[in-house]
Each structure stands twice: as structure tokens, then as C-alpha cells.
Amino acid sequence: MTLDLNLDLRGLNPAPVTPFTPDGAVDHTALAKLGTWLAGHEGVKSLVILGHAGEGTFLTQEEQVATIANLTEAVDVPVIAGITGEGTAVAVAEAKRAVAAGAKAGLIYPSHGWLRFGYQDGAPQDRYRAIYEEAGLPCILFQYPDATKANYNLDTQLEIAAQEGVFATKNGVRNMRRWDTEIPVLRRENPDLQILSCHDEYLLHTMFDVDGLLVGYGNIAPAELIELIAAGKAHDYDAARAVHDRLLPVTKAVYHRGSHMEGTVALKLALKARGILEHATVRSPLIDLSAEAEEEIVQALKSASLI
């Protein structure tokens, strides 16, 4: 089965956290509540689960499948699954399970060995080809930060973007020189490719070049990010700057932390403060943040009028 390649992600695509019960099980009721709240905002185009914000690699295969199936049933926007398996055959099997569970597309993570060692020329292209041809899952090209060896050079991005089955890119290169150089070329060579920023901590800087956002930040400030997207598309810098500045204390409290992985914990604390989650339980290797950090997040949300 091959799915629709015409998904419209031109707007906000939040990456929901995965709520857990206090004893550590996936809390599908809480996830449905979160997903329904997010999908209820006009301008939310999809929900992207099982990635970093969603602790997707911390879930068993059975939990991943159940999470896709239950969220798909709960919301009326497409559910997109993170595909994180290390080997290509493993990723294809993961993609097949995602399709069977109801996912409409896949956010394709690089093979994580590449983070340290880099990749052989042609290997990323083969990963995307196999996932689409063998699982029928439409693919989002995921550009990792420039600081890793798993980020793709421009030629690799262009080749993947031109492959059948690839309809969008989530770009998190976090190098503005490369962003300013590569995004215009991707746009010129692939005019139908939907370009989404995932620079949670650099949204203003990337807002004027994109079709939308695919961000964990969307968990906690969906209305504000939809407003930011509209300002970016209108090339209204003053309006975009106003949203950015209003959210800046939240951005700092959630994402300007010692490790970007702490952002997931901070997102859950923010959702707790907003009354969307009852608690902020995470799975190892994530650990709880301090009471002082939680208070910092609460005060930041208050300053942005989010609570």
C-alpha cells in the first residue's frame, strides 16, 4: 500500500510528547487529550510522533504501534511517525508497522551510527528509497545539525529530495551560513518540496524562508507559533519579532539548557503548568529537572501569558 504524497504540512506540525502514567506506562488517554487539544488549533496540519520530543526510541515496538494507532483514532489530522531504526531493513520494518497502524507519512531519522562516524555516499538515498518502495510510506527528509556527522551535504539533500516518495524536508542544520546557502537551492531545484524549520531556539531567524514548522515547541505554544508562521509568510518582520520576543523567556527556559534533550522534560513541565498534562513523568535516560528549573518554566509561561 502506497499512501498519499499530497499531504499539506504548510503550517504548524507539533511533535507531541509521549505522556506516561506515574508508573511509566504509555498514557494513551493523556496523549489523546494532548493530541486533540493541539489538532483543535486551526493551522495545525499534522502531529509528528515518536521522535526526540516524543521519546520515541524509548518505546518498545508494541508501544510505538499502539501510540500511532490510538492517536490516529483520536485526532482528525494526519499522524506522522518518526522512523528511527538503525539499519535500512530495520527501518523498513518499522515503516511497515507504522503504515499498518495508520501513519500517513514518516519522518526519516538518519542511521544513528552516522552521528559519530559519518555516512558513505549514497547510503542516505538508499535508506529513503527502501522505506518508500518497500513500505509505501511517504518520507520527510530530516536534516540534522551541522555539528553532527549525520547531516547531509547539499548534493545529498538534493538527491533525496528528488526521489519518489519524498515530499517535505525538516531542516535543523543550526548553521545559518548553510541555511542561507542551501534552502534557496532546495527551493529552486524542488519547488514542490515543503520546507519546514525545526529550529526551536532559532525560529525567528528561519521563519521567512519556510512553508511551516515541525517542532516540539508546538506542544506548548501552538497558537503563538501559528501566529509566527503567518507573520513569516507575510514577510512582516515586526509582527514576527513581537511573537518571538513574547516567547523568548519560554524559549530560554525550555531550550537554552545544558542539553537539548532536557527540552523534552521541560516541555512536559510546561504542559503540566498549562493544565494539559497532570504530571511530567519521563523515561530513562531522561531524568527529572530540578524544582528550580520547573519554577523557571512556570515564570516564563506567565511572562508570555501562556498561563
Where are these regions (language model features)?
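Active-site beta->alpha loop and helix N-cap motifs at the rims of alpha/beta catalytic domains
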Residues: 2-151, 287
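A general structural signal for well-ordered alpha-helical segments in protein cores
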Residues: 31, 68, 91, 128, ...
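Short helix-capping segments at alpha-helix termini
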Residues: 73-77, 102, 135-137, 162-165, ...
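C-terminal alpha-helical cap/extension of soluble enzyme domains
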Residues: 8, 13-17, 37-43, 209, ...
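Catalytic alpha/beta core domains of metabolic enzymes, predominantly
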Residues: 145-251, 255, 259
